[in-house]
Amino acid sequence: TPNYKNYGYAELIDIYATGNYYTDITLEDYRKNNTTVWNETDSQAQQGTWYCVEGSCQKLREILGNNDFMGGILVDQFYNNRTDLSRTIAQNIKDSDGLMVFDIVHIITKNLWKEVEEGMKKGGNL
């Protein structure tokens, strides 16, 4: 509805968690790959720089203002590209106020601790 935009609640929560479940990590990655995204409710493919981790964090900063948010990662997207697991962790840490890992069981069962540590170091958390 036209009034939907008037009912935000960002000021009422301590921290917002978003799912930055993108395999394009930087704006450069997104522009190079020219990725299209199909969400569950889309009738056609979508494009926009917010469909990468860096772009999503920039857009959320714009929307949320001074309110904190953490970027979430979807670990199983990176089974075949462990380097990008480290990159997405680092990018989320650098550009947001925290990191949400979905789901820790993937890190445990696939022994991805080295990649997590590397991402946290590159992100400035270790």
Regions found by a protein language model. Give the residues of each.
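Distinct, well-ordered alpha-helical segments
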Residues: 2-9
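Substrate-binding cleft of secreted/luminal carbohydrate-active enzymes
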Residues: 12-32, 36-126
